[in-house]
């Protein structure tokens, strides 16, 4: 009996020790406080709406994420053109790098000197939304079908826009060699961090861009009305026009442009309206603008790293960095 009692006591103590150890270490198994499991986070259309918000936030950028429409994408076109140049006498170094490209890797990549990371963040978030929307696994897939389809179509337009921008920056113009030269990597599904897709040709990039736009437009899920800060049908078609024009497909571009002119509510500003219309409070502000990035509060804006500070003269009424000035020829 003494032996059995000893064995029982030892077994009980061991069980208690395992149980106590498990309880003491259970705090190590908590979900990350700053992240969500991508595979289980999107359960219904409300979750999908949150992903949509994150998608548009990536397009907006902020003071830490300026390497897309937060700043760099706007300035890139000016600096690589003929009318704007860097101010070498006293510039802050925030715009001189637009004149050159240099090889970099993920180990020393900086988000402030290349239009690269954030467009792919936009693509990654769009991929996640599209995958969830088309999975058929959302709990309210039937009753919220119209909303889900709209978010899906919007994501395809933004994915096309990001790939279009990347292709134009890092690939040769399509008309040079009909797109046979290297473009950028195409991602149409969520990627693992270890994946390194190779560069597709410019033609393949445009094929993916056109497919996304065509699918979004033909889905009949995009609204025709204007919701500030969000993609609608006419914005998608306007982007389609730009794609066709970039490829030199003028008849296609004209056909879609005439559709927009004839059937949408958008009209060009009159010369007398042009200056005032840039103010969001002006009655004509949305008359011509089909899609604009909405900045709602101080968490959305780029603060001192935005284009306003870059262009503002150091000695002006609202002084900035004065990095960007007009050329003498202009």
Task: Please tell me what each predicted stretch does.
Residues 52, 123-126, 206, 213, ...:
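Inward-facing hydrophobic residues that define packing positions of alpha-helical scaffold repeats
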Residues 50, 70-73, 252-330:
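Hydrophobic-face positions in mid-chain alpha helices that act as interaction patches
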Residues 23-25, 234, 239-269:
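Aromatic-residue-lined binding/catalytic grooves and analogous aromatic/hydrophobic interfacial grooves
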Residues 1-22:
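Sec-dependent bacterial lipoprotein signal peptides
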Residues 3, 23-77, 315, 320-323, ...:
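Membrane-proximal, proline-rich intrinsically disordered regions
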Residues 92-170, 218-221:
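Conserved, well-structured interaction surfaces
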Residues 139-148, 169-203, 207:
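Short coil/linker segments at helix-helix boundaries
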């Amino acid at each position: 009996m003494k032996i059995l009692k000893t064995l029982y006591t030892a077994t009980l103590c061991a069980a208690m020790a395992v149980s106590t150890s498990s309880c003491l270490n259970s705090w190590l198994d908590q979900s990350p406080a700053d992240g969500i499991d991508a595979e289980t986070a999107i359960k219904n259309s409300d979750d999908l709406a949150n992903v949509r918000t994150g998608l548009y936030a990536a397009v907006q950028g902020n003071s830490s994420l300026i390497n897309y429409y937060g700043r760099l994408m706007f300035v890139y076109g000016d600096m690589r053109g003929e009318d704007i140049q860097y101010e070498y006498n006293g510039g802050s170094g925030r715009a001189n790098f637009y004149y050159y490209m240099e090889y970099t890797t993920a180990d020393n990549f900086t988000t402030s000197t290349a239009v690269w990371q954030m467009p792919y963040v936009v693509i990654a978030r769009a991929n996640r939304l599209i995958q969830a929307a088309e999975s058929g696994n959302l709990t309210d897939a039937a009753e919220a079908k119209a909303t889900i389809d709209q978010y899906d179509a919007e994501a395809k337009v933004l994915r096309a826009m990001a790939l279009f921008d990347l292709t134009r920056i890092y690939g040769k113009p399509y008309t040079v060699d009909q797109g046979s030269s290297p473009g950028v990597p195409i991602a149409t599904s969520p990627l693992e961090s270890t994946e390194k897709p190779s560069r597709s040709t410019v033609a393949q990039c445009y094929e993916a861009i056109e497919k996304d736009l065509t699918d979004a437009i033909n889905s009949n899920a995009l609204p025709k009305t204007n919701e500030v800060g969000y993609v609608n049908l006419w914005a998608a078609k306007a982007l389609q026009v730009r794609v066709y024009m970039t490829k030199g497909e003028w008849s296609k571009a004209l056909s879609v442009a005439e559709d927009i002119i004839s059937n949408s509510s958008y009209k060009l500003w009159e010369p007398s309206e042009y200056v005032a219309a840039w103010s969001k409070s002006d009655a004509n502000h949305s008359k011509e603008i089909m899609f604009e990035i909405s900045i709602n509060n101080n968490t959305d804006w780029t603060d001192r790293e935005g284009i306003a500070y870059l262009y503002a003269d150091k000695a002006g009424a609202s002084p900035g960095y004065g990095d960007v000035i007009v050329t003498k020829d202009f």
